[in-house]
């Protein structure tokens, strides 16, 4: 087995680990305002992921770093082509993290309801965009001879990718 294959397997394991662990967190965040009807039950659902939710992002950061180190052209093409989608994904993750922290800062029902819905949005958007990204990678993205992505953000939202985003949420 050559070094490229070993790196590819390592990066794949890191992404699979991230999606496996983070998928549970996304699911809790998406279902949180829909299934938990009172504040006590909502607190319990948040506590199921509260101790380790932020540690799961280490997997994707490590995968991105390994991709940058082992396959810089792949990294540059992927991140420049999916730049807008990844920035929206990042905003969703920030909203999600802030909602975990700010929800408990005030006991007002309106305040908590706001952050419960921010947790929903901050979990749904990244799950949807990860589905779009993975579906596009499986389908294939337009890359020119210089390894530059030649599509736009809305080219990523093709029917196959939109099916993939729904599958990632489910």
Regions found by a protein language model. Give the residues of each.
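Intrinsic disorder/low-complexity signature
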Residues: 22, 145, 152-155
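Conserved catalytic-core motifs characterized by acidic clusters
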Residues: 47, 148-151
